[in-house]
From Swiss-Prot:
Belongs to the universal ribosomal protein uS12 family. Residues 1-24, 103-124 are annotated as: Disordered. This is Small ribosomal subunit protein uS12. The gene is rpsL. Keywords: Methylation, Ribonucleoprotein, Ribosomal protein, RNA-binding, rRNA-binding, tRNA-binding.
Length: 124
């Protein structure tokens, strides 16, 4: 145990927080290219076919990113924008693809929460 005087001279260093999204390297979003678009099943007790894409980011990292919303137009070589944010029931999926940006279309016919899915306001 350190003495008070030692702590006055040299305080304890706070442990650095480990990043939840290391591939973004501190950036809010990153651009990347889809190398594979496929579906995976969630862990128990959920059941579905979740749409994901393997993406090679501009910094060279390759990550698995979730494609949110109903339906998508992504295929191999699509250029996408990646943001952080994990999917709780898909182990290893720590990133989301931003809808309505670059090659990713927004969710057509979406009326609520449109800003999260890249959809314009419908004409009345």
């Amino acid at each position: 145990m350190a003495r008070i005087n030692q702590l006055v001279r040299k305080p304890r260093r706070a442990r650095a927080k480990k990043s939840d999204v290391p591939a973004l390297e501190g950036c809010p979003q990153r651009r990347g290219v889809c190398t594979r678009v496929y579906t995976i099943t969630p862990k128990k007790p959920n059941s579905a076919l979740r749409k994901v894409a393997r993406v090679r980011i501009t910094n060279g990292a390759e990550v698995t990113a979730y494609i949110g919303g109903e339906g998508h137009n992504l295929q191999e070589h699509s250029v996408v924008l990646i943001r952080g944010g994990r999917v709780k029931d898909l182990p290893g999926v720590r990133y989301h693809i931003v809808r309505g940006s670059l090659d990713t279309a927004g969710v057509s016919g979406r009326r609520r929460g449109r800003s999260k899915y890249g959809e314009k306001k419908p004409k009345e």
